[in-house]
From Swiss-Prot:
Its main location: host cell. This is Protein PB1-F2. InterPro entries: Flu_proapoptotic_PB1-F2. May play an important role in promoting lung pathology in both primary viral infection and secondary bacterial infection.
Length: 57
């Protein structure tokens, strides 16, 4: 059962990658900016999560 469920997931991911690649050629800068923004947001969220934990400790 597990293998059957994993196969379609990989196929769908590959399909998305192909579409992203075509779009990426047109706007690679947009994707890069988005990832950088996401990373900054992720770090900020992590800091907010870690800070209270340290105070509780």
């Amino acid at each position: 059962m597990g293998q059957e469920q994993g196969t379609p997931w990989i196929q769908s991911t590959g399909h998305i990658s192909t579409q992203k690649g075509e779009d990426g050629q047109k706007t690679p800068k947009l994707e890069h900016r988005n990832s950088t923004r996401l990373m900054g947001h992720y770090q900020k969220t992590m800091n907010q999560v870690v800070m209270p934990k340290q105070i509780v400790y």
